[in-house]
């Protein structure tokens, strides 16, 4: 994923398209992550962590981080980036 992307259009669990504002993108070891917030609800500051993976078609895909240890690791990096 290019670093200059500021928003993404993704499908939610209902299949509806939702526009997200990209807060930041970073790597941890050999994995890529982005932090996004829904653009329509940007004031809520409810950030969503997405892992960037290769989809079945070879293109980038975004998945939620389900593993607690991985999520905590991403959260620590995110907090360190924005608390400095």
UniProtKB/Swiss-Prot annotation:
Name assigned to this protein: UPF0473 protein CKL_1327
Source organism of the structure: Clostridium kluyveri (strain ATCC 8527 / DSM 555 / NBRC 12016 / NCIMB 10680 / K1)
Recorded family membership: Belongs to the UPF0473 family.
Lineage of origin: Bacteria, Bacillati, Bacillota, Clostridia, Eubacteriales
A Pfam family it matches: DUF1292
Domain of life: Bacteria
InterPro entries: UPF0473
């Amino acid at each position: 994923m290019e670093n200059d992307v500021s928003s993404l259009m993704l499908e939610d669990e209902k299949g509806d398209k939702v526009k997200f504002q990209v807060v930041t993108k970073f790597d941890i070891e050999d994995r890529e992550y982005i932090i996004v917030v829904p653009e329509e609800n940007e004031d809520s500051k409810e950030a969503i962590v997405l892992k960037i993976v290769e989809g079945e078609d070879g293109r980038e895909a975004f998945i939620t981080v389900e593993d607690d240890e991985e999520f905590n690791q991403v959260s620590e990096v995110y907090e360190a980036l924005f608390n400095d």
